[in-house]
Amino acid sequence: MILYIVRHGETDWNKMHKVQGQTDIPLNDYGRRLAEETAQGMKKIPVDLGFTSPLLRAKETAQIILAGRSVPLYDEERIQEISFGRYEGLYCGGEDRDPDSEAFNRFFNDTGNYIPPEDAETIPQLYERTGSFLREISSREDLADKNILVSTHGAAMTSLLNRIRGNLSVEHFWKDEVPPNCSVTMVEIKDGKAQILKEGMIFYKEKVKKWKTV
């Protein structure tokens, strides 16, 4: 089994440095362009089926990548983004950022001391649900020889890859930065064991990176 795990394309909230979490924000024009370029780059890669977070930005990314293919695409709640509760919608960029942004930014800068709001998820809860998804598909004999697209989000994708690496740490959750929009990581699952083959593949060109919405 080969997984192609992709982070969704850009949204307006990504561009504005607003906290998304499970708030359902669609792709913007640039995000769709990234997904289209990724689809073009992956056109020679066979894909048998896909799983997507039900959130619009991930689902639309998967639909664009799989356009023109007769491939089933299944909603999978376990790979949706972590919930940030009342922090969702916070503006975290610039001098006029929201007062709570400092507490939220510990999620990225000081993860071991990040305290989620009462109505949010913890990192261990994220590890558990994304791990449940990974364990289930790894054990399915009907998927053993399939190529599978998995369309998800920055933190959810990181939790999946951390589990594959054997890292379930909260303090060291972020190995690097958040995966870029529409970056693709290739994972092989064989005899129930997963390994990362290629990480952070980008299929869009440098000129597309610089393209901006009007």
Predicted regions located by residue number:
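Short beta-strand scaffold positions
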Residues: 52-53, 128, 151-152
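GST superfamily/GST-like fold recognition
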Residues: 154-158, 183
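Extreme N-terminal starter segment of soluble prokaryotic enzymes
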Residues: 1-4
